[in-house]
Curated annotation (Swiss-Prot):
UniProt cross-references to Pfam families, sorted A to Z: ABC_membrane, ABC_tran
Protein name as it appears in the record: ABC transporter GPY2
GO CC list: plasma membrane
Region forming the signal peptide: none
Keyword tags: ATP-binding, Cell membrane, Glycoprotein, Membrane, Nucleotide-binding, Repeat, Transmembrane, Transmembrane helix, Transport
Amino acid sequence: MPPPNCLLHVEDTFGPVVKGCGSNFDFTLLFEETILCILPLCVAICLAIFRVTRLWKKPVIFKGCFILPLKLIAWNLVLGSQASVVALFSIRDETRTRASIAAGSIGIVGSAILACLSFLEHQRAVRTSSILVLYLLSTIPMDAARARTLWRMLDGRDPAIAVMVLGATKVCALVTEMLWKCSLANRHELCDAPEESNGIIERALMLRMMPIFWAGYRTPLQTEHLSKLDTKLQNAELRPSEKGPKRKQAPIKLAKEIFFSHTYEFLAPIFPRLCYLSLTFAQPFLVRRAIDYISKPKTEGSGERGDGLIAAYALVYYGIAFVSSLYEQSAVRATTVVRADLSMRIYQQSLLLDRVVDTGDSSTTMMTADVERVQLGVRKLHDAWASFVSVAIGLWLIEAQLGLAALVTLGLIGGSLLLGGYWSGRASRFQKNWMAAIEKRLHKTVQVLKGIKSIKQMGAAPAIKTMLEDERQSEIKLSKKFRLQLIALVTLSFTSLTMLPALGLSVHNAVSDKSSGRILTAQTAFQVMTLFNIVSSSIQDCTSHVMAIMVGLGSLQRIESFLNQHTWTDPRKSIRDASISTDESSVGGTSEKKVLTDVAVKIQNVSAKWTEDGEAIIRDATFDVPAHGLTVVAGPTGSGKSTLLRVVLGDLAPSSGTVSVDDSQVAFCDQTPWIANISIKENIVGALPFYEERYRMALHACALDQDIEDLTDGDKHLCGLNGQSVSGGQKVRIALARAIYSKATLVLLDDCLVGLDTNTERHILGEIFAPRGLLSSAPTTTILATSSPRYLPFANYIILIDADGRIVRQGTYAEIAPHIEQLEHDVLQVSDHAATAREPRAQDSDELPNTAITNDIAFKKGANGDWAVYKWYFGVIGWMDFVVFLFLCLGFVIGVIFPQIYLGLWSEKSLQNQIDTLPSFYGIFFGVGSMAWVALFSACVWLFLRIAVRTAALFHHLILTTTLNARMDFFSQTDSGVTLNRFSQDLQITDMELPLAFVGATMNLLMLIAQCIVVTIQSHYAGFAILAIAVVIGFFHEFYLRTSRRLRVMDIEARSPVLSLLLESLDGLATVRAYGWAAWYLRRGIEVLERSQVPFHFLQSAQVTLNLSVDLFVATLALVVISIAVVQMNTSGGSLGLALFNIVGLGQSVKGVVFFWTSLEITLGAVARIRDFTEDTKSEHESDTKPPVEWPSRGEIHFSDVTLTHSTSLPPTISNLTLDIKPGSKMAICGRTGSGKSTLVNSLLGLVQVSSGIITIDDVDISTLAKDEVRSRFVVLPQESLILSVSIREYAKLFGISDEQEIIQGLKKTGLWQTIEQGGGLDMIASSDTFSHGERQLFAMTLACLKKGKLVLMDEPTSHVDNDIQTQLRQAVFDTFPDSTVLCVTHQVATIVDFDIVLVLDDGKIVEQGDPKELLHQPTSRFAQLYSAGEL
């Protein structure tokens, strides 16, 4: 028996294990002093010196705190203790090794340096020093081990006591270092972001999440409950932008830029991931040591070894929990910063897009789906390389146990990795195609949402629904190719789990049987099985993580291609440069240069077209716009007036010639006013400083002051998406007020006064263009494009354009006036008359107040996680399909678990019995493993190609149907970003995240149940531990879910403003650039993006916290099992090996269950959103009854005491109206804005609510009929023409017109065929750039005239065309529908005389009706008064 006390010659060897004294269970003193003392000291000193140099340059932020003296006292005690240890070793030869003095001396130096670091860290850093805390935490137990060794040496008690005192002083230093100085120093403002102030211990334990979990458990979590993020995570940085053509992109240029922009965040996870890898591979060695310990009889010293084994299990498993937490936090930080970086780049690029190259619609897809995939790739980046390293290490260790048999498994592993890489590449390519299909669908969805009112009016909702569902089916078809690669990768990744042990152990057994007779012991079997489990898990991670990275790279390449698109550059030159050029090019030295202040815009030989292959719209234009006055550009519909203004604006580069403007800011009012989803005041002031007097003058000039007084919230009234909560006239006047307030020296007005009533128009013209008007009296140059000659008398200069886009005449009004009559016939629109005396101050009756612009019906029930969501989801996928899927998953689990049980029994057999049962061994391992593989493949096919595909189509159908069936007030009350989120993010979640979470949760849950049963059978007391810990973890899981669900909701809600702002800025890109508001919009983008970062990061951090709790659960269970085995010593090696092996797998299964179950709960939030949306959104359809086939056969309309309102919360728009309209009559409806004209027509279309009364058409009460059926029977020309990105042929088919010759003849009648034929004929894609506003109305009129019907409804159908075309189209309607009833809402009362009857409305009541010709001869007639008021 070795002596109890160790002598110096034994301890003065490197060891590392002492031999020849005590129980031989100890390190040698030399090993402890070199490896456990000097090495940590050297590392700490190096890091401390580097950190000191960094802190030295930083300012002092903490002063006058009592903690600092405590820290300095503690470190001085450490320094003194180190000196006493050195002193004792110098006088005690019996305990001094070769390294004792060196260790003590380095300790003294190190303590002094660390004390300096502590001083600087306290004064100049918010966070507790990680270097000091880690050093103290790691060396305190090492000092304890060193003291234990010294205590057992002869004459070693005094040095042992000195080392123990050193350890005690280090404990004091550790306590002082961990004190939260923000609170004690009363500097809470420095610690608003816990991630910046928390030390490494708090971060490892995720303590910062506890207040959030507690708040989320007690009350529904709100934004104010979330703490602030640190600056690096929350700040979205702007990047220098390259304008114009981009150089050829490098394949991974964007990836490199992101890496070098966030190098620390990308590299920070490496060290904790390596630690995690090291601790993971300690598990098989622990399994072997435990089985060795149990298999051997007890001897003296067994107790110490058992205690050491328990300590080793605690160190490894709890270490795994903490380093995994630190690693995942680092990965989350990298993901968060990349998300912010990419989102900001996409938004910044969207503001720079050249409209000729791209409209920017793809940016919405990239901002959601693509960024999401890049995030996942970044999150899995370090797991991917670590998995490859893990496979290599695992194979090396397996080879050490199985010998050459391990080489056989190498082929399977290599093949799996090669196939995984190949299929990952294919998956990336298929995913890009899928993303393109999603982008195409979302582009059309955005167009539908913008034109929803026109779609409903024309009864096109069923056709639009079919079109979008066809797009969805095409998208799903492309997704199947990606899903097939995913199935292949998932199946391949689990091949190693089922076949590696079978192949490796079978070959080993075969070789052992024939050669050395070596048996497969329980120690070797379960050590190798643990290694196989780690390798199999790593192979799964390799394939899944590589696929995630490849898919992320594919999305990154899409983003990079988007970022490398040609950006907008101002093609205009400075007017000064143009003047110098003119001077230098003058002949004979005679200067033709004008005084710079005389010319504001100079156009020289300019031709312009919207596409490279298209025909020129403006041809060889040359003119000068005089400074400081009004220049009118006049011409017929489609002549290129708007195009010319876009050229002057710089939004469109001329194909030839030069454009020169004064170096000044430009104000721009588009033909369709762009109104942002902000308040009226913010729309007018924008990015400019606020000046009260200027603001009031702009409001008064545009007749907005009284309107604002009548609004409840005044000028703080939100305008809504595209100005939905203000009237059409108010949109025009807000845009005009914006131009006036800007004080720009160049103002461009693109026919923006169309649709205003006469008095309002006269007021505005007098306020801004009269001799003392705001624009006339200011040093401002105004260019107004119009088809009307009534603005010509106000002009200082006139430019006339013919139908071919050529300038036919230019000059002053005096020069043009003699030719006015001929020009009116050839070029201009004749004077028409507005319909009303003045525009009302209240909102247009056809628009709704924006009471809840960001309202979302999300998670009323689903946010609380009721089981009804699961029941509803299972009902959607089908209960039988779910049972089949569950059965297949169960087959897979049985196929994985049963061979392990058999191996535990087989390894306990004798050599001969093992040899005799080899055939059954091969059969069970290969047969059952193959069954598991087939079951897994079948389950994946069943889920991804059957269940997921069907639910993808169904969920889109539900969202689309609910949206199209929603009442009009829904679209005014709900932000477009919220609705678009349903078609993008919610469907993205249900398409991929939900199926993956579903299969992961099901597989891991079944596997966990099986492993718990195995562990309980092999270690009975562990069953109680499993039950107790499972209850605790269950409570925490529920505690966690309340918060995580709400965080998911907040994440989605915070993302909606980002999408809304993106859509808003893209819609008004020309206006934003004109006013120079791009920087302002970038700041707004930064604000909404930074707000969206907070819930996203905390959602990811909540998942890390949950993983930490699961790891701690597994560590506790492993500790319980090994403690029971050590104490009882009545378990066989095979049983303990099976139990410990399953604990390793159980840990992965528990983490998998919790992770995937939580992911399932969170992703089911999207299902809950869909369910709640479909159940809670009010449908406009109250009846499914179809009218008779021939209805309406006469077109007779009867209103009987009808009261109409847009919402029950609003007063009626029309009250107690009774009206009879005879079949075949042609009725014009006029009145001031807000009088109820459009409401009357929309009531026939079911777009407003009938509070009382009955509306009948041909004696049929229309409230009893299906609204889509009613609308489809009418011919409707809406005020806002619908434009979709489809071909002319497909567009016509949407309205039931398929005869191509009929379509061509109709287009020829309206004069559009020549334009369309040049653009590709019926295959030409319709877009906002294809047609001008007037041509859109002509196109809508063409389709209307091709449709048959007895009732024709027209709402301002010709407001953007010239008078000749108006007359032509009106006559075309009369000729096409001679026997049909025609109702036409119009402001242009001069055209009403051709109708049979005119109906005049005021305040929702009929004030007059009759023959318009007769009424004009009655001086007291209201209609005659309106007509006279419209004369100029």
